[in-house]
Amino acid sequence: MARSIKKGPFIDEHLAKKVLAEGPNSKKIIKTWSRRSTITPDFIGLSFAVHNGRKFVPVYVTENMVGHKLGEFSPTRTFHGHAADRKSKAKR
């Protein structure tokens, strides 16, 4: 279920203050643990370091990202590939 339009997008207060302090197209990277914050048009052109549980992943915000959450661009799980099929290799 999506968030009500009446409520508006959720942005952590401490993150909103950092974004307003930086200004548009700032080169400084904003470090955050707030994966749940929605990306608004104010974020365009800014760089964030979003924590994925182990390290900070750099995220540069573009127009296409508006409306999504910061956490969507910082994957938390590492995919190492599926196990090889040993039966098909043994027949060759």
From Swiss-Prot:
Recorded GO CC terms: cytoplasm; small ribosomal subunit
GO process terms (BP): ribosomal small subunit assembly; translation
Keywords noted in UniProt: Ribonucleoprotein, Ribosomal protein, RNA-binding, rRNA-binding
SUPFAM superfamilies: Ribosomal protein S19
Any one GO molecular function term: rRNA binding
Main function: Protein S19 forms a complex with S13 that binds strongly to the 16S ribosomal RNA.
Record-stated family: Belongs to the universal ribosomal protein uS19 family.
Protein name from the UniProt record: Small ribosomal subunit protein uS19
Organism, scientific name: Pelobacter propionicus (strain DSM 2379 / NBRC 103807 / OttBd1)
